[in-house]
Amino acid sequence: MLTFLIPTAKEMTTPKESHPHLLPQDSQAILKIMTAMTTEDLAKSYRIKEEAAKKEQQRWQDMASQQSLAYPAYQLFNGLMYRHIKRDKLTTQEQAYLTQQVYITSSFYGIIPANHPIAEHRHDFHTRIKIEGQSLKSYWRPCYNQFAKEHPQVISLLSSEFDDVFSKDCKQLWISPKFMAEKEGQFKTHSTISKKARGAFLTACMENNCQTVDSLKSLVFAGFYYHPDLSTDHEFVYIKKEA
């Protein structure tokens, strides 16, 4: 069985379905630090204006006082990649695929199933804090490595910020899809192409119930197709021709 890892997103939208917020034990230490930070501290840590930091501060305070509602993570996050993932009107098989084979890597919650209930928050591995004297990446590395050992065949749709959270020896069987546009024989890639394509790729995997590495090579989605000559055992390249 294939396991997919996807990143979080800064952009969020509030779904209709909500749950009580239950915070994992490993997240408690981070919450304690975040709630102790002033608006000015948060603005510096997030590199945002103080007005925006006030909103984030309130979210942390609400979490600490157990006032926060929680929402299925794949519905709460609404970045460009998420908007290109099929999230509504799923078949029973697609719903099972999304909730059992897709996991989200978070700097606050750890690695969680796509439908895990989470609260609105802003946090990533660029957030400049120390937990028990460790960076966020060092703090989460044992948890992330344990997940990798339990799920050796991972399809990683993660961005570069996650590269060194996992130890190298845990990623021997990983495959990272790469998405490129071809125009007049020239290949290019950029953030927008990649984010849209990640969502479309995951949707195609769900719709086709892909369970083997070879099944990924036959996918055609949003104009992309597998390019064997540019691909390696650990990097599957998908090309889209531009007019």
From Swiss-Prot:
Domain of life (superkingdom): Bacteria
Entry's Gene Ontology cellular component terms: cytosol
TM region positions: none
GO biological process terms held by the UniProt record: response to hydroperoxide
InterPro entries, A to Z: YaaA
Pfam families associated with the record: H2O2_YaaD
Family per similarity comment: Belongs to the UPF0246 family.
Protein name: UPF0246 protein spyM18_2163
Protein source organism: Streptococcus pyogenes serotype M18 (strain MGAS8232)
